[in-house]
Amino acid sequence: MTEQNRRAVLLEAEEAVCSDRNADYGDPEDNFLDIAQLWTAYKNVPFTRADVAVFMTLVKIARMKTSPKVKDHYVDIAGYAACGYPSALADAE
């Protein structure tokens, strides 16, 4: 059952970040850049796309304190990790 649960979380995250999500939200790296630019303007502190992936993961971790059994938190964290790596690569360009 445990392996099945792990697989389910990863498959759901894959579906979220590798499917038609771009049609609704645009490319994740472009979306993270938009968010980083807004945060930078709001806080007057430089943020990167990779920062967005990390901070959104932290939002999910904070929510897990209240509701640790909500599968969506784990799925989203896996998705942010998957988008974070190419975001970090794009930041380095």
Labelled PLM ranges:
Residues 1-93:
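Intrinsically disordered, low-complexity regulatory regions
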